[in-house]
Structure formats: structure tokens, C-alpha cells
Regions:
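Charged helix-capping and loop-helix junction motifs
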Residues: 17, 116-117, 144-147
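Short amphipathic alpha-helices in soluble, non-transmembrane regions
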Residues: 112-120
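Midchain, well-structured core segments that form catalytic/ion-binding scaffolds
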Residues: 1-107, 134
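Extended hydrophobic-aromatic, low-complexity segments
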Residues: 90, 108-112, 161-162
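Short secondary-structure junctions
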Residues: 67-76, 123-127, 153-158
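An extended, acidic, His-containing surface patch that forms the Zn2+-binding/catalytic region
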Residues: 129-170
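Short, solvent-exposed loop/turn segments at secondary-structure boundaries
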Residues: 44-47, 111, 140-141
Length: 170
């Protein structure tokens, strides 16, 4: 049994002392590649551009919005983007980003991934490729241990909530 500080803001926002961990969330990662067409930035008219970075940006915004709609406990992060060729006077022909999603329920992450793929198909002037780079699925905690900690907190008057660990390593 480990005591651990919360690395998020859920307990602070709710003004609670303790989070009783119900399980460790899934952490699913994809490398997403947007393919457009590199061309000269000054001579290619806007109507003819196939900018991979613009396509990736549209997908990220759409995915972030979908994550908020799908579940209030689903989290979605893009922490890394690489653009090629990476020159300020060249329209990006390729953008590669790392998409990460976390949730306790595999059905939610599966649905979210399917939704992202569908959203990608709606974005013009780009083709998208998805490669799963990591899949660590959720692990529920022993219900007897959860109940024991919950009961002790209640008995001692310690404000608490039963919640999943979003950090993925507790």
C-alpha cells in the first residue's frame, strides 16, 4: 500500500483530502502522420495548398473537442509534433504527432480512437496514418482494499473520493 501525492487537480478542485484509487487507467498512444505536399510558401496560392501541419492542427482541435464530449474522465494529449521539411519558407509536407489517451474503460478509448479516425477522413488536403506505439490497459484495484480505505476515511472523518489514478503508475 502506497501513499502518494495527487499529481493532478481533482482533489484540490473538490477540496478533498484523500483520493482512494479504484484502478489505474489505460494509457494508449499513437503516432499520427499527416501527409500533404511540400511546396514553396511564397509561390503556392492558398487554394492549392496541401499543408500537413494545418491538417494536423485541425485534427488535434477536433479530437480535443470530441474527448470533452465523449467522457468527462477521458484525457487526450498531444505532447510532441515534428514538421517536415521544417523550413519557414516551405509548406509542410508531413506532420507527425504523438496522440495519447487515458481512461479506465477500454470501450471508451476504443470509441475515441474510432472517432479520431473518422474525424481524420473529413479533413481535406491531407491523408492520415495511425500507428499504435503503446497500449497499457487499465488495472482495477482490489474492491476489498478500496472498501477498507473508504470505510476508514469515513470513520475518521477524512474527506475523500473514490477515483482512478490517471498517472498510470500508482
Amino acid at each position: 500500500l502506497e501513499y502518494h501525492i495527487e499529481q493532478g487537480d481533482k482533489l484540490d478542485n473538490a477540496d478533498l483530502d484523500v483520493g482512494v484509487v479504484s484502478g489505474i487507467v489505460s494509457v494508449i498512444r499513437y503516432e499520427v502522420t499527416a501527409k500533404g505536399m511540400s511546396n514553396h510558401a511564397g509561390t503556392t496560392m492558398m487554394v492549392n495548398r496541401k499543408d500537413a501541419l494545418v491538417g494536423m492542427a485541425k485534427l488535434i482541435v477536433a479530437a480535443e473537442q470530441r474527448a470533452r464530449e465523449l467522457s468527462d474522465t477521458l484525457v487526450f494529449t498531444v505532447g510532441k509534433i515534428a514538421v517536415s521539411p521544417g523550413q519557414e519558407n516551405v509548406i509542410p509536407g508531413q506532420a507527425v504527432a504523438n496522440f495519447e489517451m487515458r481512461h479506465m474503460d477500454k470501450a471508451v478509448t476504443d470509441q475515441f480512437y474510432a472517432d479520431i479516425q473518422a474525424l481524420a477522413k473529413e479533413i481535406p488536403n491531407c491523408e492520415f496514418e495511425f500507428v499504435n506505439t503503446s497500449a497499457k490497459y487499465s488495472t482495477p484495484c482490489d474492491p476489498r482494499l478500496i472498501k477498507l480505505i473508504d470505510d476508514v476515511c469515513t470513520e475518521k472523518g477524512i474527506s475523500h473520493i473514490i477515483m482512478p489514478s490517471g498517472a498510470g503508475h500508482d
